[in-house]
From Swiss-Prot:
Residues that bear Phosphothreonine: T221
Pfam families according to UniProt: AAA, AAA_lid_3, Bromodomain
Organism encoding this protein: Homo sapiens (Human)
Primary location group: nucleus
Protein name according to UniProt: ATPase family AAA domain-containing protein 2B
Upper lineage: Eukaryota, Metazoa, Chordata, Craniata, Vertebrata
Region of interest (Disordered), ranges: 1-155, 244-286, 321-353, 1189-1208, 1217-1257, 1309-1330
Biased composition (Basic residues): 321-332
Amino acid sequence: MVNTRKSSLRLLGSKSPGPGPGPGAGAEPGATGGSSHFISSRTRSSKTRAASCPAAKAGGSGGAGVTLDEARKVEVDGSLSDSHVSPPAKRTLKQPDSVCKDKSKSRSTGQREEWNLSTGQARLTSQPGATLPNGHSGLSLRSHPLRGEKKGDGDLSCINGDMEVRKSCRSRKNRFESVNQSLLFDQLVNSTAEAVLQEMDNINIRRNRRSGEVERLRMWTDTEFENMDMYSRVKRRRKSLRRNSYGIQNHHEVSTEGEEEESQEEDGDIEVEEAEGEENDRPYNLRQRKTVDRYQAPPIVPAHQKKRENTLFDIHRSPARRSHIRRKKHAIHSSDTTSSDEERFERRKSKSMARARNRCLPMNFRAEDLASGILRERVKVGASLADVDPMNIDKSVRFDSIGGLSHHIHALKEMVVFPLLYPEIFEKFKIQPPRGCLFYGPPGTGKTLVARALANECSQGDKKVAFFMRKGADCLSKWVGESERQLRLLFDQAYLMRPSIIFFDEIDGLAPVRSSRQDQIHSSIVSTLLALMDGLDNRGEIVVIGATNRLDSIDPALRRPGRFDREFLFNLPDQKARKHILQIHTRDWNPKLSDAFLGELAEKCVGYCGADIKALCTEAALIALRRRYPQIYASSHKLQLDVSSIVLSAQDFYHAMQNIVPASQRAVMSSGHALSPIIRPLLERSFNNILAVLQKVFPHAEISQSDKKEDIETLILEDSEDENALSIFETNCHSGSPKKQSSSAAIHKPYLHFTMSPYHQPTSYRPRLLLSGERGSGQTSHLAPALLHTLERFSVHRLDLPALYSVSAKTPEESCAQIFREARRTVPSIVYMPHIGDWWEAVSETVRATFLTLLQDIPSFSPIFLLSTSETMYSELPEEVKCIFRIQYEEVLYIQRPIEEDRRKFFQELILNQASMAPPRRKHAALCAMEVLPLALPSPPRQLSESEKSRMEDQEENTLRELRLFLRDVTKRLATDKRFNIFSKPVDIEEVSDYLEVIKEPMDLSTVITKIDKHNYLTAKDFLKDIDLICSNALEYNPDKDPGDKIIRHRACTLKDTAHAIIAAELDPEFNKLCEEIKEARIKRGLSVTSEQINPHSTGARKTETRVEEAFRHKQRNPMDVWHNSANKCAFRVRRKSRRRSQWGKGIIKKRKVNNLKKDEEDTKFADYENHTEDRKLLENGEFEVSTDCHEENGEETGDLSMTNDESSCDIMDLDQGQRLNNGAGTKENFASTEEESSNESLLVNSSSSLNPEQTSRKETFLKGNCLNGEASTDSFEGIPVLECQNGKLEVVSFCDSGDKCSSEQKILLEDQSKEKPETSTENHGDDLEKLEALECSNNEKLEPGSDVEVKDAELDKEGASKVKKYRKLILEQAKTTSLELVPEEPSEPVPPLIVDRERLKKLLDLLVDKSNNLAVDQLERLYSLLSQCIYRHRKDYDKSQLVEEMERTVHMFETFL
């Protein structure tokens, strides 16, 4: 688009008829430097002001194209400008001389100058007498001072002081520099509607006149206009429209507009500067529409009201409210420079880094640890980035809880503990302790366990070490550079809290091997980690520990001193380590396991890691539980168990080992295992020969077999010091060395000759051993694995055909080389090659050459033991194999067939002992019926220590303090609302005398605040109850008749809805739940709900006593009224009623009533006297009330029934055991149970006199012993049972909660079962069935009118029936299980005699030994299996004659097949 400003300016300048020096020259500065102030479309058509100088009026008449409307505006503006009023204090005046001078110059430009200004820029100063072509507003005759661009005339560049044209370029303090602006603002505010109407008229007039003005002003030539396409034409017109819409003088701007622009100026400064700098290139359509919409909704809301609404609770903001997302309010700066951007960025960066560092806090520190000592100045309390919560870490795991890893633990102490305890050692030698170590090994070997123990060890004592735990994926992020930033923050925080430890679990996922095929992100992370661990910056006292299962996957650059100084192999534990681990896991068992059993168990657990051994102990305990109490698997309720009767046996561990698959054997089976008990007598002699040869070939095996707690390092340290050792110090340093100086004769003796000394370590030259023999001699199946089991302390690398060809991604040569590399890295080690003859024939020549090359490359004295087996004779092996294993060096051991003595030991146990064993008899426990276990009582809560109680009370008090602050804010908000003034104070009784007669519980907001101060509210629910009470009182006292009453009712409902809405919107549900838990916990602990008692006049109901001490005091005072069968039962006491309930004993349910409010002490005493009299009358009628210090689990306190429906009563009415009724009705017992769901209705059921003494005693026994809920002060009597007898049948009705609370019928029946003798268990089972039939009896008859039995509610009847059905189903399940497993006792018959011909068995043994002379080991095993099957088939026979005959036939038949 072509800029036509200057061209049109020249045209206007040449046609200007008005006087004045240089109109054309004077218009150009005005076109580019005019003021840019504007007002919105709502006020653009308002009346303008005239010029303040007299010359302006004279110049206004000389304008060529001034319309009548504009002339009228000139007169109005002139009148406004005459009334000069001082502006606000912040709007300073400019010098009047320059103003007049500029106005005189602008006057000479006339209308042409005005049009040029309106089309030149977005926000321009309006010129005299012009009308904008867009029709939005008119221009005043008074010209604003111009910021002229000095291009030819110096006089035209005069500026009004330091007044700038552009809004973004001028000084903000000169923004409202006009005398008449405040007058215009006042006038526009008062005449908004008139301005809008005039605006619409001006739009229509100027829209019709726009095309004529364009032609008259010669904006474009005809050719140029016609050549433009429609798109360019429309766009050009829209830009002209947008420019002219802001071409209004600054002094016409509304002050509220300016203030609102100032509040948004920080967000819009950059856009305004760009838009005004580009002038014609950027439209303002969106901004125009937004401004128009803002001023169309009257009235204008003041800014301070909006601010007050958003910051209602900013003074005492607590976590009880949700955090609302608030709009950031930018500050208004007077500086127009951007020099503070860098400083602002640095401040934001520092705050962001501080917040991120605070999230990287150690996992072994708690809030109290960080708030104490020097750590208080280092960090602030925050959350850890690791997925390990400090509360979830087992604090009991210490170094003494780890078995078999003493070497690793000592190394960790050298790295972490010793630099703190003995810094003088490191200072003396000027050394730094190792700062990095790498844990690697199979899964479950204790890598993470050692890290946990280290974290707990670092948390002890005065010098605590910060422990940071990260997994490999914790630092990864999808954002570019975020992973590196997290690593840098982690090391930064660790450096601030030094000494510290960073543990990277599964570090292979964080720092894999870098390669060309790898993603660049991982390469960057690895590079960052390398630089952080050992870069230019000193890492300081930061120990880095990494753990991985795949050592080869870690980048090799990490595996060097300075980064990971040490590498610890966590191999599978050997027998000694396994025994230690078993001792650790079973040290708290009672009774403890014997040392001999643990040793044998450790020997059997070959290939088990630490996690497997722990799982073995757990599985064995569960099997013992399953064997002792199988009933618990058939019931979903907790049953009473005798834990002391659960005793583990060796059989439990055996079955557990059958169920567990070791982690190391899930993918690859272990190569070594001990000789089985069956095969040991047969191959024990051969195995001992192998061990003897092994000591010669591979002397390092002695270290593995020794039970002493020593290794090579300890052998060196315990060795006697060589007195003849040479000094390693300089000759002049006599005082520093205790050694004698070297003589001239011994100069050439090497200093480091310890490796050649046989006193320090065993020496072996290429240790190799080949077990050769006939096929089936047991060298591969039994002897070699047993030998590897003996050497299990060494790492074993299996080199067989599956190891070469199982991985398709590797070639056999590569797999072979990999195995040798691993063997050389973990010396001393073993390379195991089973079936070497078959292996040599199967592999290719390349693999053979690779194997021989790698074997020869092993150093001569390197302790790498090559163990091989061959199923062929040594003479039949290939020559290359014979060259590897030499007979003359005792590297070949020939396995011979078992001799006669070995075979006799092998078959002796089977023939003489197993075949002559009597048949097994059923155990006495199996013959008896399964024991029906009673339901268990809920266990009492754990007793807290004094410190825990105090800490918990402090936390609860802090939470309740936040709740009170929130409730005060809500109450203040309601009280200060004018609509709710009538509820802010109590009702004046003098004005409304009958108020207390209608309203029994008055409530107002001032009383609510008082209750808040007295700590009466533990939850927001209690607060809302009083708000609802205010509403209900207003609705009850003010009928819906008069208009005034209707207003009060409307405001009461509004008060209720407002309070509920505020609570629902601003109260955090988690915080509310926490308050509910606090209230429930305090009720369970026996504490009163409120810390201060409410005044007597505020309640009209009886007070509730909930103190446990008072309950026990009443228990001692009235021993006959206490049920004392269990230590966990509720404490009952006979108490005096506080209000009249005389008609309750007659079985009549009436609407609950409350006493009137008492205003003084005398009325209260009088009511107490009446209640006491009422109690005496009740006692005379055979009734009294038993009150319990029990509360329901829903958290409501037992108290006033008239307050809320959520409060329930635990009152129980019963007859004293020593009292009898005089009316001959027999024993009378009344029970009252009030529940939340029944709206405070009591249930009184009277048992008939037809109950026999046995049933009565059972019921009394239940009342004494089975009122249990797990705690002494928290029992709820919702489930009080009621026994009814209708038509001679017994019916049990109860109301039991669910879950842990058991029904009363269960307790009655199970208690009867526990009292009966065990020998009559079958008869008791029949009694239970009769009781179940009694339970099925329903009460179908109507009650007599004069009876004392209360009619039950329909809902309660259904609930009671459902509970009875539930219990009946439980009893039937146990009865069904019992009947299934019940074995009828067989009549006692004499045990038949055992017939065994032992002499015949001995002959069979001799025959068997003779016939198996030439049999191999595998053939002997097959014969043993056949004989074992014969014994199993005849295991129930008392006459073993047929067994012996079948065994003889088996021996002869086996010999025939051979």
